[in-house]
């Protein structure tokens, strides 16, 4: 759950990290923006803290069923990326269960809910190599760091 100001701040971070991770690959950038859009809509559906419109649901459907599968970067690296989609979804899904558990479960939930960020170093590896992957991995930890309970 976030305020409009927090969302605006997060959007700036997302714009920055996507440009860094995708480098000069516009299809990789488009792919990451699509994932970001889907992640935001799904989070809004789950949290029920922001109205999800009919248009949001249509966008989500189009991106998942048409735009991502036809994205050239995704198609070229589908074997790597699809497995990450499965892991991202599974990690986010279980984080929503663990958040209601004991203190240890809450810590796991805190980490697992943001597993979606792990796609960024992978995209950097695929577009710019190992060193950029390491840079993006460190940058993700800085940009999206949250205190426990946030």
Name these PLM-found stretches.
Residues 1-150:
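All-alpha prenyltransferase/terpene-synthase fold signal
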């Amino acid at each position: 759950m976030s305020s409009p100001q927090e969302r605006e701040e997060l959007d700036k971070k997302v714009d920055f990290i996507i440009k860094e991770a995708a480098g000069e690959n516009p299809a990789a950038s488009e792919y990451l923006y699509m994932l970001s859009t889907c992640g935001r809509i799904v989070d809004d559906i789950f949290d029920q803290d922001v109205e999800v419109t009919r248009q949001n649901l249509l966008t989500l459907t189009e991106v998942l069923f048409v735009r991502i599968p036809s994205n050239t970067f995704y198609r070229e690296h589908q074997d790597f990326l699809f497995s990450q989609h499965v892991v991202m979804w599974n990690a986010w899904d279980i984080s929503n269960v663990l958040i209601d558990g004991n203190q240890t479960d809450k810590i796991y939930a805190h980490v697992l809910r943001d597993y979606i960020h792990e796609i960024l170093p992978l995209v950097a590896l695929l577009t710019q190599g190992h060193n950029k992957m390491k840079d993006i991995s460190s940058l993700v930890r800085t940009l999206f760091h949250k205190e426990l309970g946030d």
